[in-house]
């Protein structure tokens, strides 16, 4: 593992209250508690055109669905196309191919949004030559044969699109977005105004597509001056409105966000005119993590910050909710409910969304100094008689679900894990489904854009499998150990994903499992000691042994800390072994204590360069004598470019028997080897300088367990132990959300005496 960002301790600020526990109750129409659970995750690179490389950037951003709810259509700006997916079976999404915009226009045309109207999908296309020459169109495509039947010029650069319930009007936000690198006169780089001003384009859907008519709703006066309603509302730079997101109410009114202007506009779509304007306001938010310092510490605050809302949705015909992502001046890390009659705030989530991310291990600490979790998407819908709001976090890779039966007082229901950068949130109430499309795609980092489906109706939420209480920030659960004498207590330790090292106590008797304590690793003077701790062993006599991976071979070591977390001793690798390692060294440690003393067993992740190819090492260290004894471990092979096979964890199974995790470095649909093997140690120690290769025995193929979550299959299966209850537990390292979805899988596989026979 390479050097990563640096975590850890949540201090005095309380996490979200009882209403924002990681799971809550939501009653369906018949009073039964219902939850959404994931059914399938589909990487959209699998739906790419023939001839495109598997590594080409392919994304799913905004999506829509046909009237029967069985075909999903999404925008792929990176590929300059739209994609089609068969979701008739929510447990198995199928690709139906794509339609390239190159076939309809220019190579550089980019789709920005889509919506379905009857038998047609309307695709909003950005055709701008530059920021100062914005242009766009909407293509009307017959879904049955994917033929364009009409193209309507929009007169500017479009963003979002929405259709009203009766399919009488379509609204398109014409943003004419700013150039973040341009500096207007008297302003700073990226500031407004940057002309031309944006507006709203309304389509009246009378008759068929050939007779649809467009009507521009201007957001400035004909001479370019600001509308009085905008200045009266106190909007930022009202001479340059930049529409972001549009949404229709059930009764046909249109709500529009002006993100950079920090405003909300209501429009009478039938009359093509503005009916109300109000500011999104400013907020002071306390109890959040505001420093990118590798420490999860929600004691910071942002003061008097504009909300700068992105997505907007109607909770009913009176209230709207906004996801306050922020742009260049603001962002308040939550979502807000506004009363459209008065323009006043009725409810605000405050710090609870960010604290939720911390609680379930999805806090992206690297974004703390910017806009935090960045709530970007928001959608609302009624399922089985219950109204819900769905709020997506772009940076922490989740969607929070709320019961909005009382729209002025939303109640948190659950959190849904997503893949990286959830952009589109699409409720499909007719089929009890929610679809989320995530836009981040980087094949070189193993991060791929995907569409995920969730279905309502489960009695219990499947996520999270582990969470924290008592103000504890956590992540990178790449090590596990049972605590001697405690039937339901495990420990883990954080690695170099954070700037300080914490030993985490886990109560495995609960569902989800609960992290109940964090112990800081320090030196004798009480100063935090940062370690890339990849393995942990809880000693019967108290204290812990840590396996610490070094940036170079000689920096690998076993570290003894006492029960207070104070470092007592360091044991380096033997010089000859260290010389043959690079960055991937110690990965796991376990031990036995008997009449012969304490003996540590440690695994290194990759082969030592002087050893036979395909043979890894397991070492035994006699704490009393300081002697190392080494055994060879035969690794599986891989033919995948850039892949490798290595060891990630070790635990004692019984007298002379060890269990180890062997895994590849692949994730998602490419993951193949996530296994636990056992090895029997010889009764006689090998001769010094030799490396006898042990015979391994398959015990558990963990890959099906990882795939059973129906999400993105995690790469880093790194934690394993036998708990005091006799069960085998495993965990995945979420890499502190660095090139990872951030989801932690924590599972009980079954009884050790059955798995490790």
Q: Model-flagged regions — what are they?
A:
Residues 1-29:
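Secretory targeting and sorting signals
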Residues 28-757:
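Sequence/structural signature of beta-propeller domains
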């Amino acid at each position: 593992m390479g050097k990563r960002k640096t975590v850890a301790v949540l201090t005095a600020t309380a996490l979200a209250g009882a209403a924002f526990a990681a799971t809550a109750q939501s009653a369906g129409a018949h009073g039964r508690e219902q939850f959404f659970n994931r059914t399938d995750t589909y990487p959209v690179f699998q739906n790419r055109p023939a001839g495109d490389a598997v590594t080409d950037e392919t994304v799913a951003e905004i999506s829509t669905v046909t009237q029967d709810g069985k075909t999903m259509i999404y925008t792929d700006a990176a590929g300059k196309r739209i994609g089609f997916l068969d979701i008739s079976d929510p447990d198995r999404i199928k690709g139906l191919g794509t339609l390239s915009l190159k076939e309809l226009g220019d190579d550089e045309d980019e789709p920005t949004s889509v919506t379905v109207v009857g038998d047609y999908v309307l695709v909003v296309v950005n055709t701008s030559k530059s920021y100062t020459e914005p242009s766009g169109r909407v293509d009307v495509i017959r879904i049955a044969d994917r033929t364009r039947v009409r193209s309507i010029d929009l007169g500017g650069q479009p963003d979002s699109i929405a259709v009203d319930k009766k399919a009488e009007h379509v609204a398109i936000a014409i943003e004419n977005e700013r150039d973040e690198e341009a500096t207007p006169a008297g302003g700073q780089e990226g500031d407004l105004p940057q002309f031309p001003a944006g507006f709203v384009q309304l389509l009246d859907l009378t008759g068929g597509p050939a007779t649809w008519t467009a009507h521009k709703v201007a957001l400035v006066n004909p001479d370019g001056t600001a509308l009085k309603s905008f200045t009266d509302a106190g909007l930022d730079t009202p001479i340059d409105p930049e529409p972001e997101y549009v949404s229709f109410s059930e009764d046909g009114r249109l709500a529009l966000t002006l993100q950079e202007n920090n405003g909300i506009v209501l429009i009478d779509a039938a009359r093509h005119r503005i009916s109300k304007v109000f500011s999104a306001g400013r907020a002071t938010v306390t109890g959040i993590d505001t420093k990118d310092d590798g420490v999860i510490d929600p004691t910071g605050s942002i003061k008097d910050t504009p909300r700068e809302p992105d997505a907007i949705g109607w909770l009913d015909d009176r209230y709207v909710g906004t996801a306050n992502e922020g742009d260049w001046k603001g962002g308040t890390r939550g979502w807000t409910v506004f009363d459209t009659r008065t323009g006043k705030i009725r409810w605000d989530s405050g710090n609870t969304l960010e604290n939720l991310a911390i609680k379930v291990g999805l806090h992206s600490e690297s974004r703390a100094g910017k806009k935090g979790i960045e709530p970007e998407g928001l959608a609302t819908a009624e399922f089985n008689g219950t109204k819900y709001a769905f709020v997506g976090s772009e940076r922490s890779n989740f969607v929070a679900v709320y019961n909005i039966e009382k729209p002025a007082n939303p109640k948190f229901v659950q959190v849904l894990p997503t893949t990286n950068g959830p952009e589109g949130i699409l409720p499909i109430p007719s089929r009890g489904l929610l679809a989320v499309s995530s836009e981040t795609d980087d094949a070189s980092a193993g991060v791929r854009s995907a569409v995920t489906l969730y279905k309502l109706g489960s009695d219990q939420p499947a996520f999270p499998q582990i969470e924290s209480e008592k103000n504890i920030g956590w992540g990178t659960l790449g090590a596990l150990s049972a605590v001697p004498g405690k039937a339901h207590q495990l420990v883990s330790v954080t690695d170099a994903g954070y700037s300080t090292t914490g030993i985490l106590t886990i109560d495995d008797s609960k569902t989800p499992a609960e992290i109940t304590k964090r112990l800081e690793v320090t030196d004798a003077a009480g100063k935090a000691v940062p370690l890339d701790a990849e393995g942990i062993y809880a000693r019967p006599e108290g204290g812990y042994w840590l396996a610490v991976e070094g940036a170079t071979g000689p920096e690998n070591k076993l570290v003894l800390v006492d029960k207070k977390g104070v470092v007592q001793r360091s044991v380096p690798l033997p010089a000859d072994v260290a010389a043959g390692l690079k960055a991937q060294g110690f990965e796991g440690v376990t031990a036995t204590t008997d009449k012969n003393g304490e003996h540590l067993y440690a695994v290194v992740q990759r082969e030592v360069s002087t050893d036979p190819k395909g043979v890894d090492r397991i070492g035994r260290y006699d704490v009393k004598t300081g002697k190392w004894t080494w055994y060879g471990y035969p690794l599986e092979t891989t033919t995948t470019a850039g892949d490798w096979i290595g060891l990630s964890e070790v635990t004692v199974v019984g007298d002379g028997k060890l269990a180890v995790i062997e895994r590849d470095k692949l994730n998602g649909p490419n993951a193949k080897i996530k296994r636990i093997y056992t090895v029997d140690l010889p009764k006689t120690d090998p001769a010094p300088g030799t490396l006898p290769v042990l015979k391994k025995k398959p015990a558990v193929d963990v890959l099906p367990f990882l795939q059973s979550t129906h999400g993105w299959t995690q790469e880093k299966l790194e934690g394993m132990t036998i708990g005091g209850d006799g069960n085998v537990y495993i965990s995945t390292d979420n890499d502190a959300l660095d090139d990872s979805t951030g989801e932690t899988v924590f599972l009980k596989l079954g009884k050790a005496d059955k798995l490790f026979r």
